């Protein structure tokens, strides 16, 4: 394979990741809309997007794996392919979490509508911001965006402990409380996956594993 052809193949890999990012962005946007409006007609579209993301991620893995096997790329190109495969995998897992959220609401349709507690409303917004900045770091090759995403506080909240305590005190509808706990866990997982994407992007750009750096080193 000539260098020009190989470069074109690398560009196609990045384009596939970009397509996957677009699909996951749509899936999260619809999931956020579903949470805010509790309009269950949105669930079917989220299911379709999850299936689309699964197919795109599978194509990406096959494409990148074939390039590694056939071309035996040099370090920089190998790093790009491996990172792109990892990012694709994390993106597909985000689609899974969006699907999980939609299914939770569908399962609890008789309990809807609900007023989400402030902690969950904050998680919805912060998760969106983390996902946007993490994916932009990969596309724009921006280590500053990667650092900003990695440096954000964890999305872990006191939702679980708060509502388990209220359930024990019989001070809340247990079905609704369990829904709050489950939704918060899914949002937390999306935030964790977004941080993983940012870490992969940082490694792609700087060639350093972020987990091996002390926090102050992120800003040097």
Regions found by a protein language model. Give the residues of each.
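Cytosolic, long alpha-helical scaffolding segments
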Residues: 1-220
């Amino acid at each position: 394979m000539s260098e020009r052809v190989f470069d074109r193949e690398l560009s196609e890999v990045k384009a596939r990741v970009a397509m996957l990012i677009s699909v996951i962005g749509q899936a999260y946007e619809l999931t956020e809309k579903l949470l805010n409006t509790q309009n269950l007609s949105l669930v079917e579209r989220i299911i379709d997007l999850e299936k689309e993301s699964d197919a795109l991620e599978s194509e990406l893995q096959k494409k990148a794996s074939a390039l590694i096997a056939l071309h035996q790329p040099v370090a920089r190109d190998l790093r790009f392919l491996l990172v792109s495969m990892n990012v694709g995998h994390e993106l597909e897992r985000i689609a899974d979490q969006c699907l999980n959220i939609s299914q939770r609401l569908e399962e609890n349709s008789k309990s809807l509508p609900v007023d989400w507690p402030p902690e969950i409303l904050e998680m919805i917004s912060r998760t969106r911001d983390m996902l946007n900045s993490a994916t932009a770091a990969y596309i724009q090759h921006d280590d500053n965006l990667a650092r900003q995403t990695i440096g954000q506080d964890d999305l872990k909240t006191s939702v679980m402990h708060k509502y388990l305590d209220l359930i024990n005190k019989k001070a809340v509808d247990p079905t609704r409380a369990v829904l709050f706990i489950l939704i918060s866990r899914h949002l937390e997982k999306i935030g964790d996956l977004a941080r993983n994407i940012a870490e992969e992007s940082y490694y792609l750009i700087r060639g350093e594993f972020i987990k091996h750096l002390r926090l102050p080193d992120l800003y040097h």
